[in-house]
């Protein structure tokens, strides 16, 4: 069975649009799991029915934490399921569930699959992610437009449209709770790729997405969490020299932005502070000795 997993944070209108884009007929069996990361948002319960389950978080768990709540529930119900994590501000433009089932029957080797993501105007928003450890570059790259392949292996995929093939995992997979928002998708992919799992992206089916229609409401928090997640990822997947060069560049850029974009600048500083606060004592010293 396919389980759509949506993390809601005061986004009932967007989730409603997503739900309405899902197929009405049940030729392909599916359920929708909504994790409510805004417990006082009662409006989301208007969507609840036999096919839509709402899991209420006690507090805002962040994107990864909310996904973990849903994935754990799904795994206990059906450890062989396909879990399709999809942003509240994304939606399907056509009934493609039969294609999803056929895809995983044809390519059971894939553990984590991203789909092509378009904006409502038809522009490609995501078609693959690359990571260059030697420079610390975490890139989006169109790996799909110039190929007829059914899928292309890649380094990471966006959490906007993120499909997990649970049957490939001996234990329930999870996002690292150290990430609150941003780069948790990158970390998930790199962590499981390092364990031998295949990460890929396809254009056989996809979603439409209105970029940052949720997070742009909260500019300071968006920049703080993205800066923190960026530094945490570089710390884990690059070396000390690359990390320090990227850190210095981030701080210099924040200083430049203080006058013209103070919210962005202070968000970057807050992200650096957030990263430094979580480091264990002697972190870099132990890394240099290892």
Question: Where do the protein language model's features map onto the residues?
Answer:
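Short, well-formed alpha-helical segments that are part of the catalytic scaffolds
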Residues: 11-24
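Acidic/His-rich active-site region of diverse nucleotide-sugar glycosyltransferases
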Residues: 68, 90-172
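A conserved acidic beta->alpha catalytic loop
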Residues: 36-45, 90
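Short beta-strand/loop segment that forms part of the nucleotide-sugar
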Residues: 29-39, 55-57
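Glycine-rich, basic loop-to-helix element that forms the pyrophosphate-binding segment
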Residues: 57-77
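A short, conserved alpha-helix in the catalytic core of glycosyltransferases
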Residues: 155-164, 168-174, 178-205
């Amino acid at each position: 069975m396919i389980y759509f997993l949506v993390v809601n944070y005061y986004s009932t209108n967007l989730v409603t649009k997503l739900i309405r884009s899902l197929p009405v007929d049940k030729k392909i069996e599916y359920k929708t799991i909504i994790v409510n990361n805004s417990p006082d948002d009662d409006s989301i319960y208007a969507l609840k029915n036999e096919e839509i389950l709402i899991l209420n978080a006690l507090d805002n768990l962040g994107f990864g934490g909310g996904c973990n709540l849903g994935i754990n529930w799904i795994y206990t119900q059906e450890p062989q399921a396909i879990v399709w994590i999809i942003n509240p501000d994304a939606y399907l433009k056509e009934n493609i569930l039969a294609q999803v089932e056929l895809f995983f029957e044809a390519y059971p080797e894939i553990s984590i699959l991203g789909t092509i993501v378009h904006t409502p105007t038809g522009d490609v928003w995501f078609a693959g992610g690359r990571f260059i450890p030697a420079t610390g570059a975490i890139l989006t790259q169109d790996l799909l437009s110039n190929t007829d392949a059914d899928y292309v292996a890649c380094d990471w995929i966006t959490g906007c449209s993120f499909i997990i093939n649970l049957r490939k995992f001996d234990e329930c997979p999870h996002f690292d709770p150290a990430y609150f928002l941003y780069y948790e998708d990158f970390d998930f992919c790199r962590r499981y790729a390092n364990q031998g799992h295949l990460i890929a992206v396809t254009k056989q089916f996809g979603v439409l997405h209105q970029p940052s229609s949720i997070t742009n409401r909260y500019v300071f928090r968006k920049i703080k969490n993205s800066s923190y997640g960026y530094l945490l990822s570089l710390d884990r997947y690059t070396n000390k020299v690359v990390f320090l060069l990227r850190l210095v560049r981030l701080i210099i850029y924040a200083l430049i932005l203080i006058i013209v974009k103070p919210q962005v600048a202070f968000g970057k500083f807050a992200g650096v502070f957030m990263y430094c606060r979580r480091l264990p004592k002697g972190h870099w010293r132990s890394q240099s000795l290892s």
